């Protein structure tokens, strides 16, 4: 059935078909990666007309849908499932509102949801406020179903997809991926399968993003099995939208962690320069993956990721991560190590805490969190004459003159009662050590001795 909405859609689409074919032939990829100085949010949405890595002989299948017909969603999902393909579905907000069961089925099958505006207007004719309204109303429809597009957008009619103003408006709202396409099969015009397959043969390129339409009057659904078979006959495999916007070491790491099914979830940005040449970062729903030449790619997420970002991420004293977030041997906490000799440790009781430098080295020599000090409960702070970090079982003090030394137990209690580093004892110059009948710690201004029989702590001069 042809409706007025179908006619409007076809009129708008006709303007973009020739451009789509040209892009496929010339090999346009995406807008240049937007440099995010010091790991900052992108200033403009990245536009993907092909996958981020155009080398592999793979393609991504996507389908668009508006409100006027639901399309044969069960059949499309069955075809994709039978072929092991994860596709992208760009849906308008009014489609989501009218056909919630179909949208839930698409999401439950693991396919990528993409915000296609609320009611399919041309975006270059809208003000910033009107664009925001289109995005918000559509996303609200997804959220009422407990779903999200995670900041992915596809421009209706392909209108303004390369426009700097549109891209800036998207980025200002956290919609950092504009997921475009390489070529349109034109099944929405009701063309025979032979026409669709001819376009597949002519315009498919490595990394290509194939656009089809889900509407009931589109011939794409009927042609879908033949499209898949034709692509495979041409030597192409299939990737999914999630991995198609990643590349290189970050892409491999994301895939190795489980891609969208991992703690990272959906990609939120394209790969960006993290600080300078030879560095990269990509943001995801649940965290970020950083890469630096010679260090490799590592993820940071959750409370540790939030703390890392709050410290200044890779421009902070920590630098780049050199591990993924890793569980501690006792199973209680988690940690990331970083390139400049620092770590962030987290437990439910302590939160995410920073430990670094000579204090970290002392803590490590004493067994990390498995030693008597346990987990850090505070960050390193300045004290009289030096620096200190507090742990569950004691404290470590440092100065350039004295080095790093621990103080714990009853001796620490007496030390703090006498003013700690600000008192007459000053900074420690030894760890606690065994003496006849007890234990002792030495300080710049004297010593403290614990009696193993009485439990008393006495003090003396140097």
Task: Report each predicted region and the residues it spans.
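Active-site beta->alpha N-cap acidic-glycine motif
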Residues: 39-150, 218
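Structural recognition of the beta-strand scaffold that forms the well-ordered cores
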Residues: 59-62, 87-91, 112-117, 150-154, ...
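Residues at alpha-helix termini
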Residues: 82, 108, 144, 172-173, ...
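Extended, compositionally biased repeat/scaffold regions that form elongated interaction surfaces
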Residues: 244-462
């Amino acid at each position: 059935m042809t409706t007025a909405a179908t006619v409007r859609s076809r009129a708008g689409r006709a303007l973009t078909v020739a451009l789509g074919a040209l892009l496929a032939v010339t090999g346009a990829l995406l807008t240049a990666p937007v440099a995010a100085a010091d790991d900052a949010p992108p200033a403009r949405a990245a536009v993907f007309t092909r996958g981020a890595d155009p080398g592999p002989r793979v393609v991504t299948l996507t389908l668009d849908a508006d409100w006027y017909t639901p399309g044969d969603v069960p059949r499309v999902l069955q075809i994709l499932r039978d072929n092991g393909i994860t596709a992208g579905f760009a849906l308008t907000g009014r489609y989501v509102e009218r056909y919630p069961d179909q949208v839930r089925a698409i999401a439950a099958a693991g396919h990528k949801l993409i915000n296609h505006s609320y009611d399919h207007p041309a975006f270059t004719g809208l003000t910033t406020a009107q664009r925001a309204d289109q995005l918000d109303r559509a996303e609200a429809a997804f959220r009422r179903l407990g779903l999200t597009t995670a900041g992915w957008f596809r421009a209706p009619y392909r209108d303004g997809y390369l426009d700097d103003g549109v891209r800036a408006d998207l980025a200002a709202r956290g919609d950092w991926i504009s997921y475009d396409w390489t070529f349109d099969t034109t099944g929405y015009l009701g063309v025979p399968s032979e026409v669709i397959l001819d376009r597949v043969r002519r315009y498919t390129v490595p990394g290509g993003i194939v656009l089809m339409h889900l509407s009931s009057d589109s011939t794409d659904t009927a042609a879908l099995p033949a499209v898949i078979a034709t692509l495979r006959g041409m030597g192409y495999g299939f990737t999914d939208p999630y991995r198609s916007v990643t590349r290189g070491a970050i892409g491999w790491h994301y895939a190795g962690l489980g891609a969208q099914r991992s703690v990272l979830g959906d990609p939120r940005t394209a790969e960006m320069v993290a600080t300078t040449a030879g560095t990269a970062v990509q943001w995801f729903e649940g965290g970020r993956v950083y890469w630096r030449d010679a260090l490799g790619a590592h993820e940071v997420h959750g409370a540790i990721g939030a703390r890392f970002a709050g410290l200044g991420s890779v421009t902070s004293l920590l630098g780049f991560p050199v591990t993924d977030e890793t569980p501690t041997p006792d199973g209680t906490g988690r940690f990331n190590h970083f390139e400049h000799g620092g770590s962030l440790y987290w437990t439910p009781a302590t939160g995410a805490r920073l430990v670094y430098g000579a204090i970290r080295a002392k803590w490590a020599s004493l067994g990390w969190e498995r030693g008597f000090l346990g987990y850090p409960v505070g960050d390193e702070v300045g004290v009289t004459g030096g620096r200190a970090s507090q742990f569950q079982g004691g404290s470590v003090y440092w100065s350039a003159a004295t080095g790093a030394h621990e103080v714990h137990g009853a001796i620490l209690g007496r030390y703090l009662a006498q003013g700690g580093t600000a008192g007459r004892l000053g900074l420690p110059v030894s760890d606690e050590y065994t003496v006849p009948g007890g234990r002792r710690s030495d300080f710049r201004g004297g010593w403290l001795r614990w009696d193993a029989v009485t439990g008393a702590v006495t003090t003396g001069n140097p």
